[in-house]
UniProtKB/Swiss-Prot annotation:
The lineage of its organism: Bacteria, Thermotogati, Thermotogota, Thermotogae, Thermotogales. InterPro entries: NA-bd_OB-fold, Ribosomal_uS17, Ribosomal_uS17_bact/chlr, Ribosomal_uS17_CS. It holds the Pfam family Ribosomal_S17. One of its GO terms (molecular function) is structural constituent of ribosome. This is Small ribosomal subunit protein uS17.
Amino acid sequence: MPRKRLTGIVVSDKMDKTVVVAVEKLVQHPLYKKYVKRTKKYHAHDERNECKIGDVVEIEETRPLSKTKRWRVVRIIQRFEPERVVKEKEDIQEEIEAVEGKGGVES
């Protein structure tokens, strides 16, 4: 039987050779049938300590490595780039100022 694989974001890298990965999934509410986001955190083994906070990683189920570790990092899908986040915030701010300048927001 193939091992389960999940994709998530690294939320902590403070431990040696271990990262905490937050995995989001959509779950349908049993009564209201609305889809709700659920987040679960997994401790994953990072052999070379290459993962940093904000990285998008793929983790795979493995044998128990410790009391809480049952997953290992397979690969880093995307590195976290703080410059990109700052640039996106600046672009959004410029769009807001442009809309307000045209009279889009009335008080």
